[in-house]
Amino acid sequence: ETSARGIEIGVLVCNAGVLLFGPLAAAPPERIGRIVTLHCTTPALLCRLYGEEMRRRGEGYILVMSSATAWMPYPTIAAYAATKSFLRTFARSLNFEFRKYGVRVTGVFPGAVDTPLYDLDAACRRRLLRWGVMSAPQEVAQHGLRALFRGRSSCIPGVFTKICVCVCRLVPAWLMRCVLRIPAVARLF
C-alpha cells in the first residue's frame, strides 16, 4: 500500500504492547494468540516488508520496542515476557543481517513505562516516576531514538532498569525461584 502511493519509509518503529496478566493456564487461547500476533508476527512482517525496501536503498532505521522482561522470569506475565524475548533476539538478529546494507536496527528494553498498561492511581505513578522505577513514555522514546540514530544495537533506558536487567542476567535460576517464593515478593505477582 505505501509503495503503491509512492511513500518511502525511512524509519520504522515497531512499538505495540498488550499485557496479559495471570497464570498462563487460565488465559483464554485467543488472548494468547493476539499477544503473539501483536508482539511477534506483526513486527516480523513489517520488518520484512520495509526492511527489504531499506536494504535495497542502502539506508534506513528500524526501532524494535521490547521490554526489560525479555531477560526476567516473570510469573503471571509469561506470554508477554516470552514475546518480548522474541523481540530481543529478533532485533539483534536483524541488526546483524541488515547492518552491512546500511540499515540500522535497535532493540529498546524499558522497564515499567507510565502508560495505561498499568492500573495505578496518580499518587503511585508519581512516586514510581520520582524514584526512577517507572519511566515517562517521552523519556523512553528519546533514549530509543538517540540509540537508533547513533547506530547502537540496543538500549536499556533508566538506571533502575539497567540494574534489574543486569541482576536478572547474573542471578542463577534457582536463586531467582527462591526470591520469588518470599511472601512479600510473591504478593507482587
Question: What are the functions of these language-model segments?
Answer:
Residues 5-7, 22-23, 49-58:
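A short helix-coil junction within the Rossmann-fold of NAD(P)-dependent oxidoreductases
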Residues 15-20:
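Conserved NAD(P)H cofactor-binding loop of Rossmann-fold oxidoreductase domains
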Residues 23-24, 31-35:
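Substrate-binding pocket helix/loop in short-chain dehydrogenase/reductase
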Residues 25, 74-78:
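Active-site loop immediately N-terminal to the catalytic Tyr-X3-Lys motif
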Residues 47, 83:
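Active-site helix of classical SDR
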Residues 67:
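Residue(s) in the substrate-gating loop at a strand-loop-helix junction
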Residues 96-160:
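SDR active-site lid
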